[in-house]
Amino acid sequence: MEDTKKTVLAGNGEKDVPRAVYDGVLTIDVDAQVESMEEQEEARWHQLLNAHRTRKILTGQLGGIEKLESGWMVAVTYFNGFRIIIPMNEMMINLQGDGRENADTLNRQVRIANNMLGCDIDFIIKDLDNKSRSVVASRKDAMLKKRQTFYLGEDTEKPMLYEGRIVEARVIAVAPKAVRLEVFGVEVSVR
């Protein structure tokens, strides 16, 4: 029977119990379950744990640049409701040709990262803390993995990206005189 389930009674065998008396929320969909907020959060955290274990590339929108109490400058993004921090030295921001070669590297990176706010960035989770639910990631690792995948052919295969091929690019920053693009792991400025 579809609308009953078997329940084992103490010493009396099994008995059919109507679906209407099941514990929990009675849902419209016969086989649906209602998950608590804690269960949903655990499922999302488990997804991050799996991504960390498999080194899967994830994508999030760059939400801010912050200076931590320790003095570290980090980029902040969110994935599945969890705050992800990326140290500035793991952002792999291309500083060549920005016209400020003599300026402080960190300040240049922060300036460019501020122009990138709101753009989608790829990252790979480097470390997680189960207790505090803190996540540290690397954009650099994701970009290097994408380069390996798209620019270098596997064994005797031809690379997916080659001279003359038309490809899509992700616009990551716009300034009055230049646009920054990310093309499958390679960041370039177009003036």
What are these regions (language model features)?
Residues 1-191:
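Single-stranded RNA-binding regions, centering on S1/OB-family and related RNA-binding modules
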